[in-house]
């Protein structure tokens, strides 16, 4: 899997400690809608990191603190290659773990856009519990606490949906 960053213990993006995996690409769809401001601009300039999915799963499962895995910015659902990398990671995780951990995908796409672009995505992942955070970053929007994620989301159009 190719990523931009990995935070092995993240306490910001979910109500429980998580492993945060920053995906490598984005089409910057939010920028035209928001005066060309990107919250992930600096991340997009970082080096690409190649890491074996099995090693990453082992690292996650050997950490007694983390309870979830987050795939996030840049854009996890940017292209089919990124989606396949996530599916591969989840497949390895599902076969290796003794208990179910939550997988979270932070996407800037709307729910309708995800359903149009990847109509079988939620079914194809075959992993529960799965949370998808939908919606774009809008600068100077009204933040709110999402009840599923248990954290503040920066834009009013953003929300999480739990698939069980």
What do these predicted ranges mean?
Residues 69-72, 81-82, 157:
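Flavin-dependent oxidoreductase catalytic cores
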Residues 41-58, 77-123, 131:
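Canonical radical SAM enzyme core domain
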